[in-house]
Curated annotation (Swiss-Prot):
InterPro entries: PPIase_dom_sf, PPIase_FKBP_dom, Trig_fac, Trigger_fac_C, Trigger_fac_C_sf, Trigger_fac_ribosome-bd_bac, Trigger_fac_ribosome-bd_sf, Trigger_fact/SurA_dom_sf. Residues 441-474 are annotated as: Disordered. It catalyses: [protein]-peptidylproline (omega=180) = [protein]-peptidylproline (omega=0). Consists of 3 domains; the N-terminus binds the ribosome, the middle domain has PPIase activity, while the C-terminus has intrinsic chaperone activity on its own. Its main location: cytoplasm. Residues 171-258 form the PPIase FKBP-type domain. Involved in protein export. Acts as a chaperone by maintaining the newly synthesized protein in an open conformation. Functions as a peptidyl-prolyl cis-trans isomerase. This is Trigger factor. The keyword Iron does not apply. Residues 444-456 have a biased composition (Low complexity). GO terms for cellular component: cytoplasm.
Amino acid sequence: MSIKVTQEKLPASRVGLQIEVSGEQSRQVYERTLTRLSREVRFPGFRPGKVPRPVLIQRLGETALKANAIEDLVQQSLESAIAQESIPAIGNYQLSSDFETLVAAFQPGKSFSFEASVDVQPTATLAQYTGLTVEVAEVPFDANRVDNVLAEQQKQMATLVPVEGRNAAIGDVAVIDFQGILVESGEEIPGGSGTDFQIEVEEDRFIPGFISGIVGMAIEETRTVDATFPETYAQEEVAGKAAQFTITLKELKTRDLPELDDAFAQEASQYETIEELKTALTERFQAEHESEVKASKRDAILTALADQLDVEIPESLLQREISAMINETASRLSGQGMDVRKLFTEEVLERLRENSKDEDEQRLRRTIALGELAKVTETQVDDEAVKARAAELLSNYPRPQEVDRDRLITVVREELLEDKLLEWFEANNSVTFVAPKAAETEVDAASATVETTATETAEEAPEAPKAKKGKKKA
């Protein structure tokens, strides 16, 4: 379809199109629309596709026929305009002209004009990509982590021994009956009561005031404990409210910890000696720390690149990114056994989109900035390196025949390209590690926002007492 197209650059990476279609083309589309409708509509007394044109016009009406023809004409004209002008369009078009006005003015056989707009791939530029100074937040290595993990494993493998001659203290295991009410209304707290619950007497285990009320109790003692739900508590009906719990201490136990010896290592893990277990844990935590350091450096570099980026991100591209993040979160939650169909209501989805918009836009800026750096530095990845890395990953899959090979190649290529670009950036800019600022806890904000919003209503109050866990292999 040969058409006349006038383009206009609009804000937010949109292009305005003024399209003029010849009279002959408008007539042809109108005729094809009539033919299509004559096959699709069903009128009593007429076989499909055999409805006479006068009957079709009379039954459907001239306005409805014109509206159908214009819908076809606009769609076909836009597709032709985008192809003819080589417009890098993304997303759906938006009709700028008033549709009713177009219907009223449309006459088959006469030229037809309309206006529309469409999002296009954004044009991006990096103001600077060399000579930058980037500070990376140091990731402290917890030298006590191995000892802490072993101590926790000791607790899980400990034998519970009845306590005699003293009252409850932090670190004990208690068996209690409890019942909670809201102070203001006197109503019972939903899920706020239990019988023969075994709980760990640990600080910050429950809502403020609950555990401290148990400390000092004697066996068979009943005590009234005041507690307050945090303002940010997941259950809105009790958040920020004062509560009162009646608690009876029925049993009190302490842990008889096993020795950290070879027998412990053999029971807690696949290792024969305690030294082998400590070495394995040390190596694992060091590898995790190296990954965290790499992630911290990546985050700082991508943030610096995004700050140098001049781009207008189209709305359709942003919405696509938001949808991808929601789908990824839904898949992860589903893998954890959650019913995402119940979790992701229309209200929740609307909140997800709104809450994650800023973070998703920032992630898009980083992706675009990295792509622009690849262009200006002419950085590419060798095909053989991609194939070798993909083969290495496939060898670790239990069922490699189920892997989407094309998708794997794409992901590997992107990862290797990113690694090369980050190396190039570090070689051509100043990247230094500095002590993290106070209260600086950088996370994947988009994912955290989405997952928190999706799951915050799944929690119950007060927190259910924890049953003793089974033995864990280190």
